[in-house]
Amino acid sequence: MGTARFLRAVLLLSVLLMVTFPALLSAEHHDGRVDICRLPSDSGDCLRFFEMWYFDGTACTKFVYGGYGGNDNRFPTEKACMKRCAKA
């Protein structure tokens, strides 16, 4: 039973890394700076509920932010998100 649980955890971690790592690589500029608008949505580590906005690659979308952690693809308003991330 313990081995199955461990293998399941390893599999889950592997899948998360396969999804997250390429997204982080593609968010990097040639000079090493990170384009925050290309980072994936990240609700953070806490359990509070703040309605925020992130850029999903084509539009600004609402999500619930936990209040701590996460990444910089997080904006207090749709307008702030669009101003930073929408390409004219």
Curated annotation (Swiss-Prot):
Main location: secreted
S-S bonds: 37-85, 60-81
UniProt keyword annotation of Nucleotidyltransferase present: no
Keyword annotations from UniProtKB, A to Z: Disulfide bond, Protease inhibitor, Secreted, Serine protease inhibitor, Signal
Subcellular location: Secreted
CDD domains: Kunitz_huwentoxin
Expression by tissue: Expressed by the venom gland.
Keyword Disulfide bond: yes
Family recorded in the similarity comment: Belongs to the venom Kunitz-type family. 03 (sub-Kunitz) subfamily.
Protein name as catalogued: Kunitz-type U15-theraphotoxin-Hhn1g
Native organism: Cyriopagopus hainanus (Chinese bird spider)
